[in-house]
Every structure is written in structure tokens, then in C-alpha cells.
From Swiss-Prot:
Organism: Persephonella marina (strain DSM 14350 / EX-H1)
Similarity comment text for this entry: Belongs to the universal ribosomal protein uL11 family.
Encoding gene, per UniProt annotation: rplK
The protein's name: Large ribosomal subunit protein uL11
Keywords in alphabetical order: Methylation, Ribonucleoprotein, Ribosomal protein, RNA-binding, rRNA-binding
GO cellular component, one term: cytosolic large ribosomal subunit
Length: 145
């Protein structure tokens, strides 16, 4: 018989930097999860990632207070900011351009994000990422709108 799910928690935590402090502690504490056990397993699972990379995680909590978690790929906006070398997107993306990314950088990001996007086609994934870039005020070189 399958375990009974009592809740799912979605958090964005920097890789290798999970700690019992907010937002992790209170979110897990509400469901009675062993916080230190999660922190240790999350930090171990993100050991290969660059420290500080924001990683979305979906934690499934069961009735016996056990849990499982799934690591997602970093948000497209985070990857685009890294590629363009900027701190934040434009406040007015239509008028203000804050950085540039090439078609090759868009392809790399699309390949990373592929498993979380709702497409199997790399070209469609590139268009999704390019749209995110445009909405952040990042200019995309070599890719038609």
C-alpha cells in the first residue's frame, strides 16, 4: 500500500545552502518533518551544483512524517541573468535593454531547462527561453521574434 501524502511544499533554496532558518524551517516544521534530515540530504543532492544557484525543490510529506523531494532546474530568469552578466532584469523591458545573450547561450539554457518545459522540441524550448529574456529586457542576438 502506498504512503498517504499529507502535503507538498515548494521552495526555492540556494544550492548547498539549505539551513533550518526561514524559509526552510517553518515550512517543514508545519508538517512535522525532520528539518535537519532534509537540510543534510538537500545539501548532499546539490553538491555538484555551483554554490548559491537557486534551485526549486518540491517536497512531498507523508503521514508517517517521512518525505521525498524532487530538484527542478534553476529558473530561466536566473540562468539568463548569469548568461547576460546582470544583477536584475529591466524595470521597463520594452524601452530599456539591460544586457545581451546570443543564440548559443539561449540554446544552452534551453537544453538545461528542457526537462521542466512542456515541449520536446529544442527550437520550441529556445523560443520559450527567448521570450523570457525579452520580458526581462535582455536582447537576444541571432534569433527572430
Amino acid at each position: 500500500m502506498a504512503k498517504k501524502v499529507v502535503g507538498t511544499i515548494e521552495l526555492m533554496i540556494p544550492a548547498q545552502q539549505a539551513s533550518p532558518s526561514p524559509p526552510v524551517g517553518p515550512a517543514l516544521g508545519q508538517h512535522g518533518v525532520n528539518i535537519m534530515e532534509f537540510v543534510k540530504s538537500f545539501n548532499a543532492a546539490t553538491a555538484e551544483m555551483k554554490p548559491g544557484t537557486v534551485v526549486p525543490v518540491v517536497i512531498t510529506v507523508y503521514a508517517d512524517r517521512s518525505f521525498t523531494f524532487i530538484l527542478k532546474t534553476p529558473p530561466a530568469s536566473y540562468l539568463l541573468k548569469e548568461a547576460a552578466g546582470i544583477k536584475k532584469g529591466a524595470s521597463d523591458p520594452k524601452r530599456e535593454k539591460v544586457g545581451k545573450v546570443t543564440k548559443e547561450q539561449i540554446r544552452e539554457i534551453a537544453e538545461i531547462k528542457m526537462k521542466d518545459l512542456n515541449t520536446e522540441d529544442i527550437e520550441a524550448a529556445m523560443r520559450i527561453i527567448a521570450g523570457t529574456a525579452r520580458s526581462m529586457g535582455i536582447e537576444v542576438e541571432g534569433l527572430e521574434a
